[in-house]
């Protein structure tokens, strides 16, 4: 049934600024952008990482009714090779700490999370299993 995520969407009140911020963070420009009915940018999408996962930035005016305006809920953790360095970079770019750097057991898992300047929770994680799967797929 569930085979992997297709797109993660982050809502933003300032899509132009969010697109610039994520382009700087990721070191790439969005590969796809779409205007809304009024001609203003409504959606920008990046492909990132080893599996080219999609991160979509969406103008909040298109959010479903009842979408939370405050950070919280599910945290998607993106694998990083150095949680401390990634965490410091995010904070230096204006993100705010949501979850401090936290070792998870004794198997090498480490997580942290921030709230981006647009109100979205962004998790980062060093995950040995991610690297094992990457290695076994021949992508390492």
Which residues does each PLM region occupy?
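Conserved active-site tyrosine of GNAT-family acetyltransferases
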Residues: 18-23, 90, 119
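Vicinal oxygen chelate
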Residues: 1-7, 26-79, 87-115, 126-140
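Catalytic core of Fe(II)/2-oxoglutarate
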Residues: 11
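Active-site-proximal beta-strands of protease catalytic cores
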Residues: 123
């Amino acid at each position: 049934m569930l085979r992997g995520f297709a797109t993660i969407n982050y809502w933003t009140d300032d899509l132009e600024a969010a697109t610039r911020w994520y382009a700087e963070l990721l070191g790439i420009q969005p590969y796809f952008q779409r205007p809304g009915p009024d001609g203003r940018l409504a959606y920008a999408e990046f492909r990132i990482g080893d599996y080219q996962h999609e991160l979509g930035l969406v103008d909040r005016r298109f959010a479903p009714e009842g979408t939370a305006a405050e950070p919280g809920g599910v945290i998607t953790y993106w694998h990083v090779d150095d949680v401390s360095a990634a965490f410091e970079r995010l904070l230096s770019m204006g993100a705010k700490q949501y979850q401090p750097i936290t070792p998870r057991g004794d198997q090498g898992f480490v997580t942290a999370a921030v709230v981006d300047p647009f109100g979205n929770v962004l998790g980062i994680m060093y995950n040995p299993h991610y690297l094992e799967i990457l290695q076994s797929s021949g992508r390492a």
